[in-house]
């Protein structure tokens, strides 16, 4: 019978860095509220949560890399909102942010949770920031907690 390794959802004693974009702040602030809510509900102490506000989504990977390199955190949660406009800017930013965040996780060996919305409309972003479609910031924080614990169980 195989041995299964699963992470639990206990954030007690863990430290978290959160990188959040100021651009589209009316969305990103809801994502941040959701992430902090999830961490605290699962046992994290608010004093073990550090939030770095950055200008936009494109800057998320560098800020996440800097947080990961500081070795102060068990996981980093990335939050932002890229909403499609009438130019190709959406494709460039959303692609680079997702690749950059994945790269930081692989290079650092630290769980980096992706809570960056990439939506076609503002309405879709609002739905994913705490209304009809849940709160993706909350979900990213839960992912971070579980991933930290499963990685610890593997070692």
UniProtKB/Swiss-Prot annotation:
The active site is at residue 89. Keywords: Riboflavin biosynthesis, Transferase. It catalyses: (2S)-2-hydroxy-3-oxobutyl phosphate + 5-amino-6-(D-ribitylamino)uracil = 6,7-dimethyl-8-(1-D-ribityl)lumazine + phosphate + 2 H2O + H(+). One of its GO terms (molecular function) is 6,7-dimethyl-8-ribityllumazine synthase activity. One of its GO terms (cellular component) is riboflavin synthase complex. (2S)-2-hydroxy-3-oxobutyl phosphate binds at residues 86-87, 128. Pathway: Cofactor biosynthesis; riboflavin biosynthesis; riboflavin from 2-hydroxy-3-oxobutyl phosphate and 5-amino-6-(D-ribitylamino)uracil: step 1/2. InterPro entries: LS (IPR034964), LS/RS (IPR002180), LS/RS_sf (IPR036467). CDD domains: Lumazine_synthase-I. Gene3D superfamilies: Lumazine/riboflavin synthase. Belongs to the DMRL synthase family. Catalyzes the formation of 6,7-dimethyl-8-ribityllumazine by condensation of 5-amino-6-(D-ribitylamino)uracil with 3,4-dihydroxy-2-butanone 4-phosphate. This is the penultimate step in the biosynthesis of riboflavin. This is 6,7-dimethyl-8-ribityllumazine synthase. The gene is ribH.
